[in-house]
């Protein structure tokens, strides 16, 4: 008899951290989100509050404190789920300077960065920005690529970005 394999997933793009930008307003909603994630087989969640210069700019120290408190509160809710902190970076021309100055924009101190673009981004801009980020030594994770018109018009472009070394993230729901 064959043994069934249980697959577990990692959610690398989550606004589960309550009280921060797109996150829930309260801990009760975060707890419910954790339970749903667990039921769906997720065993690691990277909380990725937005980083958008001039808009979503909560300081890193405050964000880290909020995250550590959240992590402590969630310990008894779903102890099997590992929590990590990252950011969802809205790409602008200033981001390269910010990346150079602030390593805390990565996913849990790794070389991976989650990058979001405007839905009508031009493919040439998207490609150039990915190349620039990679030249700095980071691995770009392109957030919700299914939202970008240039890619919707030609899905081969997503493969081209992947072949450059970018990671492609799509929303599941």
Regions found by a protein language model. Give the residues of each.
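An N-terminally biased module of ancient metal coordination in phosphate/nucleic-acid-related enzymes
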Residues: 1-80
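Metallo-beta-lactamase
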Residues: 15-24, 155-160, 170-173
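Extended substrate/RNA-proximal surfaces in nucleic-acid metabolism proteins
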Residues: 57-169
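Active-site metal-binding loops of divalent metal-dependent hydrolases
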Residues: 14, 50-51, 88-89, 145, ...
């Amino acid at each position: 008899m064959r043994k069934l394999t249980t697959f577990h997933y990692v959610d690398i793009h989550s606004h589960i951290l309550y009280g921060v930008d797109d996150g829930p307003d309260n801990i009760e909603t975060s707890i419910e989100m954790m339970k749903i994630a667990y039921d769906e087989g997720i065993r690691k969640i990277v909380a990725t509050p937005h980083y958008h210069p001039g808009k979503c700019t909560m300081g890193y120290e405050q964000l880290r404190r909020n995250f550590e408190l959240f992590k402590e509160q969630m310990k008894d809710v779903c102890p099997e789920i590992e929590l990590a902190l990252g950011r969802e970076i809205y790409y602008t021309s200033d981001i390269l300077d910010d990346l150079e100055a602030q390593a805390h924009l990565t996913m849990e101190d790794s070389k991976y960065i989650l990058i979001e673009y405007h839905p009508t981004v031009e493919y040439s801009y998207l490609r150039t920005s990915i190349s620039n980020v990679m030249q700095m030594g980071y691995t770009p994770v392109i957030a919700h690529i299914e939202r970008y018109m240039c890619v919707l018009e030609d899905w081969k472009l997503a493969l081209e970005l992947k072949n450059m070394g970018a990671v492609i993230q799509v929303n599941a729901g």
